[in-house]
């Protein structure tokens, strides 16, 4: 009989078991991607509306919003594929992204500020009392 206590850890082999990635992880990544695309379609719709029914300033703003929407679509696609590959490789890294939403907010803020500045400057030039 062994003299070692029963509950004591003994140095032994580690058994390598394949870890299973739950399907809900892939679906969550896909839902996030579709949410980003939903936002970009709305932003692109705003750009098209400004382009069709706006004046010269509206066309400038439409271009800005359309470029922000297209950039966001590309960002969402790259992020989706990066996360999907990391999930397939069972990467342990963080999957959150602080840079993308921050840049999106910054570019939207710039587009809105440019729209306001052009609108105020254009209206002040045409409405002299």
Curated annotation (Swiss-Prot):
- Kindly report the protein's main subcellular placement as a broad class: membrane
Parts of the chain that traverse the membrane:
33-53, 60-80, 99-119
Membrane-related topology note: Multi-pass membrane protein
Q: Which gene encodes it?
A: VTC1
Q: Which organism is it from?
A: Saccharomyces cerevisiae (strain ATCC 204508 / S288c) (Baker's yeast)
Q: Which residues lie on this side of the membrane: Vacuolar?
A: 54-59, 120-129
Which positions are tagged coiled coil?
Answer: none
- Could you tell me what this protein is called? Vacuolar transporter chaperone complex subunit 1
What's a single GO MF annotation on this record?
mRNA binding
């Amino acid at each position: 009989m062994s003299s070692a206590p029963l509950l004591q850890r003994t140095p032994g082999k580690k058994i390598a078991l394949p870890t299973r990635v739950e399907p809900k992880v892939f679906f969550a990544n896909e839902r996030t991607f579709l949410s980003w695309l939903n936002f970009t379609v709305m932003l692109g719709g705003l750009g098209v509306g400004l382009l069709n029914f706006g004046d010269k300033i509206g066309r400038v703003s439409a271009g800005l919003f359309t470029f922000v929407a297209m950039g966001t679509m590309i960002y969402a696609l790259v992020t989706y594929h990066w996360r999907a590959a990391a999930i397939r490789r069972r990467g342990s890294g963080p999957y959150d992204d602080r840079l993308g939403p921050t840049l999106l907010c910054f570019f939207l803020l710039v587009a809105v500020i440019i729209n306001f500045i052009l609108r105020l400057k254009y209206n002040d030039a045409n409405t002299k009392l």
